[in-house]
Curated annotation (Swiss-Prot):
The keyword Heme does not apply. It comes from Yersinia pestis. This is Rhamnulose-1-phosphate aldolase. The lineage of its organism: Bacteria, Pseudomonadati, Pseudomonadota, Gammaproteobacteria, Enterobacterales. Pfam families: Aldolase_II. Belongs to the aldolase class II family. RhaD subfamily. The keyword Transferase does not apply. GO terms for cellular component: cytosol.
Amino acid sequence: MQAILSSWFIQGMIKATSDMWHKGWDERNGGNISLRLLAEEVEPYRRDFYQQPRKVELTQPAPELANSWFLVTGSGKFFRNVELNPAENLVLLQVSNDGMAYHIHWGLTQGGLPTSELAAHFQSHIVRMQVSGGTNRVIMHCHATNLIALSYVQKLENASFTRLLWEGSTECLVVFPDGIGIVPWMVPGTDGIGTQTAEQMREHSLVLWPFHGIFGSGPTLDDAFGLIDTAEKSAEIMVKVLSMGGKKQTISREQLIALAARFDVTPMAAALDA
């Protein structure tokens, strides 16, 4: 067995994709994850790399990510199959030193490419690296059922949607005080939706793609998963509340402010006033 299969990052990706599939967020080949790795984390596994790595040109240059390593889910791959055959469904790649291409060093044993949303991932990685001082290393996308459902019946506006989720569960303001960003519906797998997502990622660690899914970012796979899981739980609660006739009482603005003070977080101001 290849040593890389027992690495923390392959095992972590197996767990994340399995958990997300069991949640019902990643049907068929839905969803994608990218994890930025440090050179010293990858170095011990070089003996498992391809002797002649395949080079692929990027659709959009990413000089900010030059020489960076990423573990990414493959395009058209099913999350439910990652744990069965990680080498076929994942890919370890390194961006070229000019940021114009990447080389596939491991994975995709049956051929193929990284996720079709790679441009969106890379653009979001660049922004989240900047705003987090390099601590954010994960971009995660999935089709979270209740968040998608709410996008059909709620105003697609950052502040009001954030306020709805904050009121759905007390923990939400603490977990994502920066709120949720929303982009217009766009064709997936394009540079355009990647640009729009990255713009929202500058202010928000969660970005909703209406009628499609959610993007989340964080320092670790657990953090990104937990962020989405928390927002999705609140969305599920709100879907049930709406189905029962709507709210008769809720968490007030004053209570949200008190909550933020207790946990020393700075809440999105516009959402407090929504």
